[in-house]
Design a protein with these regions (language model features):
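A short, basic/flexible loop-to-alpha-helix module at the beginning of a structural domain
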Residues: 1-8
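Mid-domain catalytic core of redox enzymes
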Residues: 31, 227-348
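Short catalytic/ligand-binding loop motif for oxyanion handling, primarily in non-cytosolic enzymes
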Residues: 45-47, 94, 100-101, 156, ...
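Dinucleotide-binding Rossmann-like beta1-alpha1 core, especially the glycine-rich loop
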Residues: 54-127
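C-terminal catalytic lobe of FAD-dependent flavoproteins
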Residues: 325-396
Length: 396
């Protein structure tokens, strides 16, 4: 229960023990401020939560590969864990035929048999020209037209269309063109999915990172798991002068301007008696008929597993409703208008509350962006400049 602690002893209430909330609490503790974190799940780390089973580090909410060009973020996270340098190399399965991702010379050879950049560029230009001719002088009106105008019909039909429609639960002709502003195309033989300088997986998983933040906080962070903020909302808001809220902003305001749209995910995991089920950490299924979007085989992230055992997880996108977890926002014009109403309400009615994170700001963040946004919030809250103390060997 919330009354387990004397709430008068805290400087901050933090709603949500995911990365944003945990970083803020840790940095507040370094500045002598005490925080109470309430988390509805039975554990910390949010969607980055990991656990070890059969010697395999399993990501409980989909594959999280850390990648960034931000050295400050990279140095910061490595205070708490060793990273293994893993680079994601995704394979796409379209009706039983395999292609490398992202789109690069390997993909083009698999698609068309082209062997040189000139041949691949000519093939793409030929297909783009046909697409632009069909459009006439107008701009693409939907995602399908946008994608074909950027990359051509072959790659769109086999590697984009089915995956995207499953991910969003909408036909590509019903999705706005701005979802795909550009497509990464490489005219080199390079399967490294993320084109970032710093990449890797924490050895032992992500949960330990936030456990170490707690252990290093000198008793200035308390966490109540299995505690739903909304069961105690009025009491907590009346007792805490400063709040960091990382949940859904529309839920905080009881959906008074309407529900924002989200996409949800469902995961099915299976232990298999094998040392190697699919030969790769991530395989995307890009056809429309396969109900899941990808299959993860976790042992390939770090090479660690008990002999003869592997664990796979299938990821199924699904419509969100209030009984499901919200994973990512649907940032179309309608939802943007609704979110702006909530953001204005937050500024005017609750200046004492910081709304942060992916759900609090109704914005998709990669992990490094969550860290960077948390740094920005800390700097604003405590009126400091660069004050994140860490040291690393720059050669790593």
């Amino acid at each position: 229960m919330v009354n387990k602690f004397n709430t008068k002893n805290y400087d901050y209430l933090i709603v949500g023990a995911g990365p944003f909330g945990m970083i803020f609490a840790y940095e507040a503790a370094k500045r002598g401020k005490k925080s109470l974190i309430v988390e509805k799940r039975p554990y910390i780390a949010g969607n980055t939560h990991t656990h070890v089973e059969h010697g395999i580090t399993v990501h409980d909410f989909g594959a999280h590969i850390f990648h960034t060009d931000n050295k400050e973020v990279w140095d910061y996270i490595r205070q708490f864990a060793e990273f293994n340098g893993y680079q994601n190399q995704v394979v796409a399965n379209y009706q039983g035929t395999l292609y490398n991702l992202p789109f690069n010379m390997n993909t083009f050879y698999q698609m068309w048999g082209t062997k040189t950049p000139d041949e691949a560029q000519a093939k793409i230009a030929e297909q783009r020209e046909l697409a632009l001719k069909d459009l006439g002088n107008r701009q693409p009106r939907n995602l399908e037209e946008q994608a074909i105008s950027l990359i051509g019909t072959d790659i769109y039909e086999k590697l984009i269309k089915g995956y995207t429609e499953k991910q969003w639960g909408r036909l590509a002709t019903e999705l706005p063109a701005f979802i795909i502003k550009r497509l990464p195309v490489r005219f080199i033989y390079d399967n490294n999915y993320f084109n970032h300088r710093y990449q890797g997986i924490p050895v032992g998983g992500y949960t330990q990172i936030f456990e170490r933040m707690l252990s290093q906080s000198q008793g200035l962070i308390d966490v109540l798991t299995d505690t739903d903020f909304f069961d105690h909302k009025e009491t907590l808001l009346s007792e805490f002068p400063r709040v960091l809220y990382t949940g859904m902003i529309d839920q905080f305001f009881d959906y008074q301007f309407g529900e924002l749209e989200y996409r949800s995910l469902r995961f099915e995991s299976e232990v298999i008696d094998s040392d190697n089920y699919q030969g790769n950490a991530v395989i995307n299924y890009t056809d429309a008929k396969t109900p899941y979007t990808r299959v993860m085989e976790w042992r390939h992230l770090d090479g660690l597993a008990d002999a003869g055992k592997t664990i796979i997880t299938k990821e199924y996108p699904q419509e969100w409703d209030r009984s499901k977890e919200a994973y990512y926002p649907v940032n179309n014009d309608k939802n943007t208008r609704i979110y702006k109403q909530y953001a204005q309400e937050a500024r005017q009615k609750h200046p004492e509350i910081i709304f942060g994170g992916r759900l609090g700001k109704y914005r998709y963040f990669d992990m490094d962006q969550v860290f960077n946004d948390a740094f920005h919030t800390v700097r604003e809250e405590f009126n400091v400049a660069a004050d994140f103390n860490f040291a690393h060997d720059d050669t790593k």
